[in-house]
Amino acid sequence: MENNMVMVHEIPFPPEIKTTKPLSLLGYGITDMEIHFLQVKFTAIGVYLDSDVVKHLQQWKGKKGNELAEDDDFFDALISAPVEKYLRIVVIKEIKGSQYGVQLESSVRDRLAAEDMYEEEEEAALEKIVEFLQSKYFKKDTLITFHFPATSPTAEIVVTLEGKEESKLKVENKNVVDMIKKWYLGGTSGVSPSTISSLADNLSAELSK
């Protein structure tokens, strides 16, 4: 199995994972930031999707990857497609859970506020996520996963510290769940341009089959 691993900046990702059905690794990349003129990599990201997703993206058949990467309507269709989605995020540079939580919270809150959807329910759901993350310390190789079922507007976040300690949180606010998807899969506004570019190239290839 090891030989089949896809290496994302020296972090191995399985080409397929099984949840309720097999999901394929269709996009991967990193989050990074320039600090004191050095490019620091924080996380490696793998995006796993049900291969049926291409049925919902047929109107983009024939488009090249670089065209799709710039097309936010394409990524909106990907996010709203009623298929299972799974994000596997591996920590490269250790970070406090509270720092990761603040990044997630501010991005999701800003996106909700921009669409006039930030109400008390959304605030409460975000607070629960921040509380869940803030007591943790994400060492290198900590695994964070987001599982988005095909038909339910929920998400399950799982954090595995040092390969053993699993904690789970279910997010049940649909608006917050949608904006978490947009944080990672939101086209030109996504947190990881390399992941968006990889998704666009691979989905372009899948659509041309």
Curated annotation (Swiss-Prot):
Stated role: Involved in the biosynthesis of prenylated phenolics natural products which contribute to the bitter taste of beer and display broad biological activities. Involved in anthocyanin biosynthesis. Polyketide binding proteins (PBP) which promotes the catalytic activities of CHS_H1 and PT1L and triggers demethylxanthohumol (DMX) production.
Keyword presence, Isomerase: yes
Catalytic EC class: isomerase
Location of this chain's protein in the cell: Cytoplasm
InterPro entries from the UniProt entry: Chalcone_isomerase, Chalcone_isomerase_3-sand, Chalcone_isomerase_bundle_sf, Chalcone_isomerase_sf, CHI3-like
Coiled-coil boundaries: none
Record GO terms (molecular function): chalcone isomerase activity
Complex and partners: Component an active demethylxanthohumol (DMX) biosynthetic metabolon in glandular trichomes (lupulin glands) that encompasses a chalcone synthase (CHS) and a membrane-bound prenyltransferase. Interacts with CHS_H1 and PT1L.
Principal location class: cytoplasm
Reaction(s) catalysed by this chain's protein: a chalcone = a flavanone
Species, as recorded: Humulus lupulus
Gene Ontology, cellular component aspect: cytoplasm
Protein name: Chalcone isomerase-like protein 2
Highest taxon, organism lineage: Eukaryota
Family of this protein: Belongs to the chalcone isomerase family.
Tissue-specific expression: Mostly expressed in glandular trichomes (lupulin glands), and, to a lower extent, in cones, cones bracts, leaves, stems and roots.
One Pfam match: Chalcone
